[in-house]
């Protein structure tokens, strides 16, 4: 009560914000008369003038009033449309990192031209983001004449564009496109092989249309680029035949390797390495089978992929044993957990090892379909320097916008007072009674010539209603968000006299319903219309418009309450645009999912007390309040799910940003010589530490093991034992320095042989290729970790903390493996000339091109592992039953002994 009193005296926060912005609106209005006197050329010259002032140090805020006045005047000349004061307010809200709630029909598309123009003056690019390709193209083409009049360029970013077309779109001052496409371009840029292949500029300003749909409804579904690698099953099978002919090198009790075997096994570290004899033997076998050119080396730059396959096959044969490390069941290789002894169906070893084991066992070799890159919209849009959005319904989600994105919501007043009549909900006992009442209401509206928009929550429900209308011989149109262009036409004409349109909640969003129909579309449908034709179309429309207004305007008929109040408000907002007449009503039944799950007991108890008969409805504010409380519960639960998803994805996001930043630095750097030097010192030191522990006595040193490891992994043949025998003053530190210096000398010799420029380019290629491969494996490991992390809760551990800790360990492991693998490859590979590096790059691109990339806006349940079963209401990916359907009276499969209908069948 005290809060209400304070609001009455001082105004709400929203009122105070608008009051502050009104001062700037007054300034813009004061400039209008002067700007009207400017010639077209003088008005166009304003853009160059503003850019000069910004370059001289002026802020966007200081030129806002003049810039907005310029756009308003240009719009009057180009479109014959003048921005209302409320649209100027909306433009200012959008420029200040906030969300503008503007009702349907208030001209959001025209409002967006103001902040888009202002922020484009910086030259850093503006992204105007819509929910589908049709709206992106429509808004870009509609606003292009205005922006081009003012000297700005406009680009369109939609799926299917070539690389150059994408670059051109992003280099434009203002780029229109869909949220999915901007997100996928970001991921593709971070998978590019060279700076020239990147298309996006640094992310500066994003202006999101239908911001609630993109930042809230789609926040749980990440963008994923996945791909099945090329089918190498033939190669795995061929290489598999080479390994049985290789001989293991014997070991003496002293653990020193003796004899002339082809490979040696370090069982402690679970590693296997070729001996020099083994390398030669494998190369000869590959040449015999035509898999390697005569005189070519397995370790040459162009054969890295072949070497990878050979190593995988060797590991499969020597380190992995059937019925110990894996079992073969129904033609599939299934991993056995080394700690628990349980099988792990669905899990696969990485780096081609699983395929190599499949080849060894003679079962079908499956392609890996791995995640190549992924990001959630929550994390993508937080990368922008400035972010703003507009929608007709944001206030109910204001807390989430502020909490997750740091965006305040400002409700912008309508240009004309809202006169729509929102009637109380009617609640029936059964769905059948509800549908009969809906049909009766539609017939009543048609009798008086009032257009009706029927909103449904699913395509299934819209098809059911359509069948009922066919039965009742009611002419109607059905929309279900499948065909955007057709959709816009139907929605545009949904305001004609007596029109009946059935639409799912999201269908047709972004297109206004004009009372009497859209006369602009009728004119556009004609080829070269004459002035008389235009006048006749407009006169006919005016007659229809007046008739529809007299009949009560557009009637919105909701067939079910959505789980979010915001979606219901969007449906209602279709009527009453720009002060038009209109009405709305929701019809509910106790069989609706929201009522059944959340509001049933209280409301059905109320209905029984009132002694209702069939066909009777209850209409009372208490019922509406109970339903609203049910919706609040669902909204709170969905917010918690999105928040939990973000907390988990933030961990991956921090790692993603580190890897992508490192990758971009690598691509942009002229040389990574210093990086290689630092890595080399770390890697060689780490290997030495394993055999000569720091500050340990000489008796604990494993010198033969170190000699062999250095030779196998770094092609470094050093007589370390000989040095120690001959030089008494050689201690741990000096020995370490000598080994590192020996590697550096060997590497310098390689550099002198091939030339510094060639080696520098090769270093970058190896580093990028290794990083990409390990990052893909890391994403798969993170997926596996996420899927089971919720089970830690049963062990009284915090799943989020456990996930953070273990994912950090995985990331540390990635960095450590990256360093080791890069130095190992650079040590082993023989680069003869520039052509070797080019061939390696060409093969890499070839392999990448063979990957069938799949761009998914995929369901995100896996991102948070177990979801505590709170997804019954979410219409995401349907579950596919695996096995026979359980009958209602059958014993419950859970083993409780009760009938299915009395146990888990209750929940279905």
UniProtKB/Swiss-Prot annotation:
Any one GO cellular component localisation term in the record: cell envelope Sec protein transport complex
Single GO term (MF): protein-exporting ATPase activity
Chief localization: membrane
One biological process term in Gene Ontology: protein transport by the Sec complex
The keyword Cytoplasm belongs to this UniProt entry's keyword annotation: yes
Region annotation (Disordered) ranges: 865-908
Binding partners and assembly: Monomer and homodimer. Part of the essential Sec protein translocation apparatus which comprises SecA, SecYEG and auxiliary proteins SecDF-YajC and YidC.
Function (record text): Part of the Sec protein translocase complex. Interacts with the SecYEG preprotein conducting channel. Has a central role in coupling the hydrolysis of ATP to the transfer of proteins into and across the cell membrane, serving both as a receptor for the preprotein-SecB complex and as an ATP-driven molecular motor driving the stepwise translocation of polypeptide chains across the membrane.
Family of this protein: Belongs to the SecA family.
Protein name according to UniProt: Protein translocase subunit SecA
């Amino acid at each position: 009560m005290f809060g209400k009193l304070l609001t009455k005296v001082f105004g709400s926060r929203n009122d105070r914000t608008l009051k502050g912005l009104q001062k700037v609106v007054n300034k813009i209005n004061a400039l209008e008369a002067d700007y009207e006197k400017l010639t077209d050329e003088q008005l166009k010259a304003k853009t160059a003038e503003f850019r000069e002032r910004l370059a001289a140090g002026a802020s966007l805020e200081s030129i806002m009033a003049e810039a907005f006045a310029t756009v308003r005047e240009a719009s009057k000349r180009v479109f014959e449309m003048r921005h209302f004061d409320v649209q100027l307010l909306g433009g200012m809200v959008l420029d200040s990192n906030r969300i503008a709630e503007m009702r349907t029909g208030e001209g959001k598309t025209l409002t967006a031209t103001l902040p888009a123009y202002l922020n484009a003056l910086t030259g850093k690019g503006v992204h105007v983001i819509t929910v589908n390709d049709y709206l992106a193209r429509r808004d870009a083409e509609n606003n292009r004449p205005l922006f081009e009049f003012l000297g700005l360029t406009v680009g369109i970013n939609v799926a299917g564009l070539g690389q150059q077309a994408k670059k051109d779109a992003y280099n434009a001052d203002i780029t229109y496109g869909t949220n999915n496409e901007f997100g996928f371009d970001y991921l593709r840029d971070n998978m590019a092989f060279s700076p020239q292949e990147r298309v996006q500029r640094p992310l500066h300003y994003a202006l999101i249309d239908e911001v609630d749909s993109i930042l809230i409804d789609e926040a749980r579904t990440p963008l994923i680029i996945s791909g099945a690698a090329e089918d190498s099953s033939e190669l795995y099978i061929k290489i598999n035949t080479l390994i049985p002919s290789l001989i293991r090198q014997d070991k003496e009790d002293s653990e020193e390797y003796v004899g002339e075997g082809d490979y040696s096994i370090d069982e402690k570290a679970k590693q296997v390495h070729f001996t020099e004899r083994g390398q030669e033997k494998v190369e000869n076998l590959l040449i015999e089978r035509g898999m390697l050119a005569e005189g070519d080396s397995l370790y040459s730059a162009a054969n890295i992929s072949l070497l990878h396959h050979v190593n995988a096959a060797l590991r499969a044969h020597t380190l992995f044993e059937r019925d110990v490390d894996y079992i073969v069941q129904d033609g599939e290789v299934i991993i056995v957990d080394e700690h628990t002894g349980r099988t792990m169906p669905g899990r696969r070893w990485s780096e081609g090892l699983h395929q190599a084991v499949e080849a060894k066992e003679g079962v079908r070799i499956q392609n890996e379909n791995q995640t190549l890159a992924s990001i959630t919209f929550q994390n993508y849009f937080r990368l922008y320097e400035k972010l703003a959005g507009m929608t007709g319904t944001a206030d109910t989600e204001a807390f989430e916008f502020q909490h997750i994105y740091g965006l305040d919501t400002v409700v912008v007043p309508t240009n004309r007072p809202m006169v729509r009549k929102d009637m109380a909900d009617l609640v029936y006992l059964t769905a059948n009674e509800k549908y009969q009442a809906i049909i009766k209401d539609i017939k009543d509206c048609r009798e008086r010539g009032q257009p009706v928009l029927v909103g449904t929550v699913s395509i299934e429900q819209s098809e059911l209603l359509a069948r009922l209308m066919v039965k009742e011989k009611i002419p109607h149109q059905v929309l279900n968000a499948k065909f955007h262009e057709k959709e816009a036409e139907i929605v545009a004409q949904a305001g004609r006299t007596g029109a009946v349109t059935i639409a799912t909640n999201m269908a047709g969003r972004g297109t206004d319903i004009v009372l009497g129909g859209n006369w602009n579309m009728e004119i556009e449908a004609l080829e070269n219309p004459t002035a008389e034709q235009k006048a006749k179309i407009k006169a006919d429309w005016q007659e229809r418009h007046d008739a529809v207004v007299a009949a009560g305007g557009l009637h919105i008929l909701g067939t079910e309450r959505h789980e979010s109040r915001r979606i219901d408000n969007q449906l209602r907002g279709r009527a009453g645009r720009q002060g038009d007449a209109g009405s709305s009503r929701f019809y509910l039944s106790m069989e609706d999912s929201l009522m059944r799950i959340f509001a049933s007991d209280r409301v059905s108890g109320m209905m029984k007390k009132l002694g209702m008969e069939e066909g009777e409805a209850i209409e009372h504010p208490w019922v509406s309040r109970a339903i609203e409380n049910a919706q609040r519960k669902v909204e709170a639960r969905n917010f918690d799910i999105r928040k939990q998803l973000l907390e988990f994805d933030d961990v991956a996001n921090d790692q993603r940003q580190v890897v992508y930043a490192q990758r971009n630095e690598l691509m942009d750097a002229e040389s990574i010589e210093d990086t290689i030097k630092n890595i080399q010192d770390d890697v060689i030191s780490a290997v030495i530490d394993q055999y000569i522990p720091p500050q340990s006595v000489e008796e604990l040193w494993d010198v033969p093991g170190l000699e062999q490891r250095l030779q196998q992994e770094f092609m470094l043949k050093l007589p370390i034992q000989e040095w120690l025998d001959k030089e008494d003053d050689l201690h741990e530190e000096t020995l370490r320095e000598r080994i590192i210096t020996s590697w550096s000398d060997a590497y310098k010799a390689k550099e002198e042989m091939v030339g510094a420029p060639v080696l520098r380019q090769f270093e970058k290629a190896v580093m990028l290729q290794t990083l990409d491969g390990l990052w893909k494996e890391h994403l798969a490991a993170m997926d596996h970790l996420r899927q089971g992390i919720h089970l830690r809760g049963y062990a009284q551990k915090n799943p989020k903390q456990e996930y953070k800790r273990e994912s950090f360990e995985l990331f540390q492991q990635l960095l450590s493996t990256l360093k080791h693998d890069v130095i190992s490859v650079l040590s082993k590979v023989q680069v003869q000339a520039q052509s070797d590096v080019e061939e390696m790059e060409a093969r890499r691109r070839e392999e990448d091109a063979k990957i069938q990339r799949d761009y998914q806006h995929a369901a995100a349940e896996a991102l948070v592992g177990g979801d505590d079963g709170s997804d019954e209401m979410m219409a995401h990916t349907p579950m596919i039953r695996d096995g026979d359907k359980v009958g209602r009276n059958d014993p419950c499969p859970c083993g409780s002994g009760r009938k299915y209908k009395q146990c888990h069948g209750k929940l279905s």
